[in-house]
């Protein structure tokens, strides 16, 4: 044993005292969180190799906004740069006969713990997404899909987010239901080959070639671990049992007791032929198919026999799939965390990943980043092979956002990450730790989605003094018992108004943020002679210091305000050699002719990761005889922003740059530019922690000329969440 991992009484008491101050009552601080926070990592190499155990629990069917849209410091209900509908309203407002917006499911007065599942099939998710507009939620779902929880409703999960690291850009792998997403989680794809054919888009898993419905047949990641000699195991309370209606009429208390042995068919390995047909005494069967639950997990932890990789499959009543409520999941996660922290020596070397397979059709405001799926809807510098479902011609994913919390001694501090991830990111993390490659992950997905390593401070320099705000957090087991009976005497959470006058907002307060590998650009050039709009997108993320991956790709979404359809562009931060021999990467150019109306007017936005935003308005036809300021930025290593403006037009102009007052006390700046004259001015961003929002207007220009630039300047170092998240969206 080394000094680094020791369960220090002084540290334990310090965290407990901090939490008691925040909560007002020390008894409200869950013992499992106090124990987990009090253990410091076992630092031997200062790298990912210090991780000896990875434990993964994938829960069911909850979206990010549904659970964490109200949490402070995340890109939730106050997102200042959410997509807009074509009528100019933000996508918080969803139309279908009436207008709907997110509404609170108050578990103190309603039976919000007990709601029906929404439509979450392939066709439903794609209809909601609507080619990127994300505006058809109410055309597909019931109003209940707009419901969300607050801290008082899911206190333990908010406490986990306050204590450890939450991902605000973790996406389900497919715009589809549970089983295909779990296939991605366990094997890197949902098809026997990587060409987009025979993709499993439903839950039956029958591929028509084996003759046994519910069986799939390709190599899984656990099989690759076995071949490499890496120890792994599945923990589950029992197998799958049909959820027929009979149990609805048995004794109320015993209803969920009966479901404690039912894994709801969520052990994805049971769908694969090699596992389903394995002899009962075989290694595959013994590792993946046996019933061994949290009690056995705790025993293995205490006896120091926990495998290197563990997948946990929750029982039906604790998996959080509607109608089973979040309090049941909180209880189960508490048990898992209690088991993992019962031996401080083991916990000091363990990473616990809590994620969700898909969002069930519950509302999330962020559009899904996807590859271009046909001509005219974007471009990519990296191959999109295997990412377009052949029979429909639609993108497979990514899907909408779902929660992921990284719980470990290396990920303390209530931080948030805006790096883009999906279920294959979990496999990529295992790749980095154990050196076993998952060959099924597509090139596009490897480029766009990170490997989770940025969530962890393996040097141990993280702030271990941070205690979470645990106000009003009761014991999770008592909440679970109370939640069960609510279904019998509380009304359902009915939608409150068909003409919402306000949006829900978020808790106040910023949150520490982790560095992300993006340094993005979007500039517009008006080609007067050819009558074209030319968009240039750039990604300099590879040049960022401290980038744990060294490279990444970013998905830009071009969102037209009135004319044209959304487009998606994938731009790598590194060169990629194409089949033609051409080298693409770092920048990408395209013409946006379909975004011009008959009079030459254009109005569109460009969205990217971590709140990256550009907005362009003007009139191409009128620009020929006018001043024509073109605007770009240079990111400085010290976190400041250099704004570059050049007048390429025929007339002089007066350019006004107006900052968002939420970021700075500085007023507008004005510049006089002759034709072909340029200026470069630095904007200091220290007071806004690197966030900026600048609007550029000018005289003697095309009608309604506007260039708006917003986002965050990355330096490779941690920062703070967007200050505008403290201000209600409008």
UniProtKB/Swiss-Prot annotation:
Keywords: Cytolysis, Hemolysis, Hydrolase, Signal, Toxin, Virulence. The keyword Flavoprotein does not apply. Predicted to be exported by the Tat system. The position of the signal peptide cleavage has not been experimentally proven. The keyword Acetylation does not apply. It is an enzyme of class 3 (hydrolase). One of its GO terms (molecular function) is phosphatidylcholine phospholipase C activity. GO terms for biological process: hemolysis in another organism; lipid catabolic process; protein secretion by the type II secretion system. It catalyses: a 1,2-diacyl-sn-glycero-3-phosphocholine + H2O = phosphocholine + a 1,2-diacyl-sn-glycerol + H(+). Residues 1-38 form the signal peptide. GO terms for cellular component: extracellular space. Its EC number is 3.1.4.3. Hydrolyzes sphingomyelin in addition to phosphatidylcholine. Belongs to the bacterial phospholipase C family. This is Hemolytic phospholipase C.
């Amino acid at each position: 044993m080394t000094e680094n991992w020791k369960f220090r009484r002084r540290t334990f008491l310090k965290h407990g005292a901090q939490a008691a101050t925040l909560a007002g009552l020390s008894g409200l601080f869950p013992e499992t969180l106090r124990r987990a926070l009090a253990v410091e990592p076992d630092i031997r190499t200062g790298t990912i190799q210090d991780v000896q155990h990875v434990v993964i629990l994938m829960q069911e069917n909850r979206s990010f906004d549904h659970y964490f849209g109200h949490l402070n410091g995340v890109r939730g209900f106050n997102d200042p740069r959410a997509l807009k509908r074509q009528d100019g309203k933000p996508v918080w407002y969803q139309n279908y006969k009436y207008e709907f917006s997110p509404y609170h499911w108050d578990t103190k007065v309603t039976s919000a713990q007990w709601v029906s599942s929404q439509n979450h099939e392939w066709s439903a998710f794609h209809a909601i997404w609507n080619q990127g507009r994300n505006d058809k939620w109410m055309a597909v779902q019931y109003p209940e899909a707009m419901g969300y929880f607050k801290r008082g409703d899911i206190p333990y999960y908010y406490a986990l987010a306050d204590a450890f690291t939450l991902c605000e850009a973790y996406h389900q792998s497919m715009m589809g239901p549970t089983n295909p997403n779990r296939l991605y989680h366990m094997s890197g794809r949902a098809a026997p080959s990587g060409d987009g054919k025979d993709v499993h888009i439903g839950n039956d898993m029958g591929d028509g070639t084996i003759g046994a419905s519910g069986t799939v047949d390709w190599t899984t990641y656990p099989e690759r671990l076995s071949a490499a000699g890496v120890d792994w195991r599945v923990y589950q309370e029992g197998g799958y049992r049909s959820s027929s209606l009979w149990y609805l009429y048995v004794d109320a208390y015993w209803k969920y007791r009966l479901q404690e042995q039912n894994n709801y068919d969520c052990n994805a390995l049971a769908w694969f032929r090699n596992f389903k047909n394995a002899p009962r005494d075989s290694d595959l069967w013994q590792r993946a198919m046996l019933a061994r639950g949290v009690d056995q997990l705790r025993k293995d932890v205490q006896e120091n026999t926990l495998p290197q990789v563990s997948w946990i499959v929750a029982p039906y009543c604790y998996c959080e799939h509607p109608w089973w409520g979040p309090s049941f999941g909180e209880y189960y996660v508490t048990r898992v965390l209690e088991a993992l922290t019962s031996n401080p020596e083991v916990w000091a070397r363990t990473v616990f990943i809590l994620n969700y397979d898909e969002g069930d059709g519950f509302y999330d405001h962020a559009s899904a980043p996807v590859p271009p799926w046909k001509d005219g809807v974007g471009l990519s510098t990296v191959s999109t092979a295997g990412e377009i479902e052949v029979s429909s011609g639609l993108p497979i994913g990514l899907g909408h956002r779902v929660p992921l919390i990284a719980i470990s001694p290396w990920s303390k501090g209530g931080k948030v990450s805006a790096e883009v991830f999906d279920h294959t990111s979990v496999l990529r993390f295992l790749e980095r730790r154990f050196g076993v490659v998952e060959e099924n992950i597509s090139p596009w997905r490897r480029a766009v989605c990170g490997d989770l390593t940025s969530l962890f401070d393996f040097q141990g320099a993280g702030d271990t003094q941070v205690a979470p705000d645990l106000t009003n957090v009761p014991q999770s087991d008592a909440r679970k018992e109370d939640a069960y009976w609510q279904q019998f005497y509380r009304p359902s959470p009915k939608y409150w108004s068909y003409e919402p006058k306000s949006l829900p907002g978020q808790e106040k307060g910023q949150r520490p943020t982790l560095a992300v590998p993006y340094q993005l650009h979007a500039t517009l050039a008006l080609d007067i002679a050819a009558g074209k709009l030319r968009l240039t997108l750039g990604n300099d993320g590879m040049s960022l210091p401290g980038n744990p991956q060294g490279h990444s790709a970013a998905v830009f979404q071009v969102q037209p305000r009135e004319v044209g359809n959304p487009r998606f562009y994938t731009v790598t931060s590194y060169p990629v050699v194409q089949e033609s021999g051409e080298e693409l990467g770092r920048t990408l150019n395209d013409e946006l002719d379909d975004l011009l109306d008959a009079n030459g007017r254009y109005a569109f936005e460009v969205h990217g990761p971590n709140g990256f935003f550009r907005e362009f308005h003007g009139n191409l036809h009128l620009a020929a005889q006018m001043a024509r300021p073109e605007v770009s930025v240079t990111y400085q290593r010290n976190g400041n922003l250099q704004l570059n403006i050049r007048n390429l037009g025929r007339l002089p102009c007066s350019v006004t740059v107006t900052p968002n007052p939420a970021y700075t006390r500085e007023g507008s700046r004005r510049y006089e530019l002759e034709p072909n004259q340029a200026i470069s001015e630095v904007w200091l961003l220290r007071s806004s922690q690197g966030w900026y929002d600048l609007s550029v207007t000018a005289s003697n220009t095309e009608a309604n000329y506007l260039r708006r630039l917003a986002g965050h300047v990355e330096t490779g170092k941690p920062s703070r969440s967007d200050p505008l998240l403290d201000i209600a969206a409008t």
